[in-house]
């Protein structure tokens, strides 16, 4: 039997990237919206920033990379998850060859620069920014950290920790 490719049924791979340090609803919403960019039956692949990368660009991660990877793999929209490269963020793009790279609404990537660099490296994929963002009291890891720092815990509250 001869097989043919029908673009209407072709499964698209969407790649989403991030730190995913302290998981919160904003992460879940981003991943759901990222997967939708690929249409029906899309496959969502998530690439997590390595601890060394997070330290260099943001802060020391609260949760280590292996545990962050384990938690992200448990999230409903995620089909596969990987740790990124410590030296070349495009290495995993080259290896996985996604159809679409999803950029979060709060991620500081210049879409045009990213597209140009992908083309320069011979990588053919769309780059799309997730436009929606679900606001909530604790919709970022930094907000969670700041709230914890402000709280005063007495010994009774911590005795079972």
Swiss-Prot record:
Does the keyword field hold Nucleotide-binding? yes
Cofactor names: a divalent metal cation
What is catalysed by this protein? FMN + ATP + H(+) = FAD + diphosphate
Keyword terms: ATP-binding, FAD, Flavoprotein, FMN, Nucleotide-binding, Nucleotidyltransferase, Transferase
Q: Could you say which residues bind ATP here?
A: 19-20, 24-27, 106, 133
Spell out the InterPro entries in the cross-references: Archaeal_FAD_synthase (IPR050385), Cyt_trans-like (IPR004821), FAD_synth_RibL (IPR024902), Rossmann-like_a/b/a_fold (IPR014729)
The GO annotation for biological process reads: FAD biosynthetic process; FMN metabolic process
Per the record, the pathway is: Cofactor biosynthesis; FAD biosynthesis; FAD from FMN: step 1/1
Q: Which Gene3D superfamilies match?
A: HUPs (3.40.50.620)
Question: Which CDD domains does this entry report, sorted A to Z?
Answer: cytidylyltransferase
The answer to whether UniProt assigns keyword ATP-binding to this entry is yes
Q: Name one GO molecular function term.
A: ATP binding
The record's listing under Pfam families reads: CTP_transf_like (PF01467)
Q: What is its EC number?
A: 2.7.7.2
NCBIfam families the UniProt entry points to: cyt_tran_rel (TIGR00125)
Q: How does it assemble?
A: Homodimer.
What job does this protein perform? Catalyzes the transfer of the AMP portion of ATP to flavin mononucleotide (FMN) to produce flavin adenine dinucleotide (FAD) coenzyme.
Q: Which family does it belong to?
A: Belongs to the archaeal FAD synthase family.
Q: Please give the name of this protein.
A: FAD synthase
Q: Gene name on record?
A: ribL
